[in-house]
Amino acid sequence: MFRIESARIIAGVTRIVRDVGIAEEIAQDALVTALEQWPQSGVPDRPGAWLMATAKHRAIDLVRRKETYARKLAEVGRTLEDEPPPAEPAEPDDIDDDLLRLVFTVCHPVLATEARIALTLRLIGGLTTQEIARAFLASESTIAQRIVRAKRTLAKAAVPFEVPYGADRGARLSSVLEVIYLVFNEGYSATSGDDLVRPALCEDALRLARVLAALMPEEGEVHGLAALLEFQASRIATRTGPDGEPVLLADQNRARWNRLLIARGARAMSRAGSGPYALQAAIAGCHAAAVRYEDTDWAAIATLYGRLVQLTPSPVVELNRAVAVSMAEGPAAALPLVDALAREPALSAYYLLPSVRGDLLERLGRPREARGEFERAASLTRNERERTLLLRRAARL
């Protein structure tokens, strides 16, 4: 329950104290108070409202101690000191507004990407430092220091606790969406370690995307991201075999794809715009719509990737487009596209480039060259499951 409520409590308290680090401490203090009192007094009818009221009382006490009572009380305009907890819950719109402000604050561009991810999972996702460290194969002390430094950076930069509007809004929203997207991707296809998939990270990112879509119903790209994650999450259970080995898309048991998540993805897609996340969601939707691998509309997918390249030029997107072209028009049509990408500095250490090239060469009947590409790809990946699969493909040739 606290994981669900913690983000809202931290958001509500941050509006008072204007410091996410202090707000988190107060929220945790409210939880400790609940653990001490509830066994004797019983769980209140609205535990979330009780926690919120208790935390806000603590926040106001802190403000009163730090600043002149009259000036600070007038500034924050609070009257909660007259209301003993448990109190009536705050208006849902007020809570949602505070939560949205917190999302934009912890994803502020003043923070490095790794710091934004860690702070978002901690304050919005409600994960413990230990859980975040385990998910990203980092030490607990490293993650703890990253979170502490991020809080200090926000305080030092005096990042306003507000939802941006005007010209700054688009860039700030992109920063928020990027954090959620990166968290999901790390769970969907782990960059390192012994596991290909980390479902818990995908679940956390999907939950954040759903929350954001509910908070910003007018933003098409938010729904585009939500749709993308719903579609992708529908396949997670089939991406690995019984022993954790990777299962290629062509070999996945589509009867095990989660139809509820696919339906949710389709609903979110109906509210998406035409931005990069919406286009990626449309591509994922094409895969989800195919009952069999052979039914996949690769021509449509190649077209969508072409549009995505125009919106967000990227060699990785170009590589994905080349794969779709190879399926729609044959490997001979795609090989020149992949060869052209070999000159891209950004892909020089990207294991999927030689992996895709190896697949094309194998399909073209050039096994010796294909084997060399698979071996090179295996040397570049940091994921043990991917490395094993690539070496197995090389050994077959």
Region locations from a protein language model:
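A short, charge-rich alpha-helical start-of-domain segment used by transcription regulators
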Residues: 1-11, 21-24, 170-178, 182
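Amphipathic helix-loop-helix modules that constitute alpha-helical solenoid scaffolds
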Residues: 66, 74-131, 138-306
